[in-house]
Amino acid sequence: VIQHYALICKLTNHKGDDVTQEQRFEQRIAQETAIEPQDWMPDAYRKTLIRQIGQHAHSEIVGMLPEGNWITRAPTLRRKAILLAKVQDEAGHGLYLYSAAETLGCAREDIYQKMLDGRMKYSSIFNYPTLSWADIGVIGWLVDGAAIVNQVALCRTSYGPYARAMVKICKEESFHQRQGFEACMALAQGSEAQRQMLQDAINRFWWPALMMFGPNDDNSPNSARSLAWKIKRFGNDELRQRFVDNTVPQVEMLGMTVPDPDLRFDEESGHYRFGEIDWQEFDEVINGRGICNHERLAAKRKAWEEGAWVREAALAHAEKQHARKVA
């Protein structure tokens, strides 16, 4: 009887049932019950997740480029093997996340094409060049360190497939962060030229790493709704503060300095206070006018076009396999 009533309400666009569904959804959110693909969800919730998961997936895929650029120039065979494994992990993370996005009813090819067309974004950090080997260590340490702060909270996001993907991704990102810090430690204990190279990399990546958490909460158009639906668990400013508190002691342990003259430790609050982020630079990069924006998208478009035959072959093989099973 209930199923028949639900069907009638759906066919007649019965508003009462819609309210009941929304109330049930909000109740599940309040009770910390994961929302699964087969569950009813508001269209705005679905669209918000597609945007966030899609951008997260794009970031993993585009993030392979600045590091992949150094695979052939790694200083030792050990470093090369580590970097190869890391870039391979990033590709896997992108695939997990595209699969999670597909559970929301979107097509992987569609959201990927939107990224290539500039209609979907990826993390601003990957629009900065990697100029030295120290940059690779600093990306692992600072950039993946910032990602971990963000992503550990996402292990408890309200959408089940996203949360489960994040559990695996966070384990691998922790390895990446430790690998990056170990590479930076080796440079910090090396020659004066190596130490200067490390400090230069920190100087260039410190502020972009802070920008990874997004705009201040007051200026973030999506944060309030994402927090209410528990897609996000913490605001951008709180996560950014956690990263600074975690990372400044690590910088000092390496004998390096944070490129922020306003940085100080506040005894009363127990937090580090840091200077104002250059939000104009953030806006420029996020809107496609960064140092490497054009280069990154050009590389991805080239790979997409040259890889068309692989996708076609895989599809043809899948169709043959399906036909055999049906027969």
Model-derived segments and their meaning:
Residues 20-24, 81, 86-114, 180-185:
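Conserved alpha-helical segments that form or flank metal/cofactor-binding pockets of metalloenzymes
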Residues 34-54, 114-140, 157, 190-194, ...:
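Acidic/His metal-coordination segments adjacent to aromatic residues that form catalytic metal sites
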Residues 40-45, 63-85, 147-162:
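Helix-loop segments that flank and shape redox-cofactor active sites
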Residues 45-56, 74-93, 136, 161-173, ...:
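Alpha-helical scaffold segments that form or flank carboxylate-/histidine-based iron centers
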Residues 126-179:
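Internal, conserved structured core segments that host functional sites
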Residues 157-208:
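Glycine- and acidic-residue-rich phosphate-binding/metal-coordinating active-site segment common to enzymes
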Residues 196-327:
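Extended, helix-rich structural scaffolds rather than catalytic motifs
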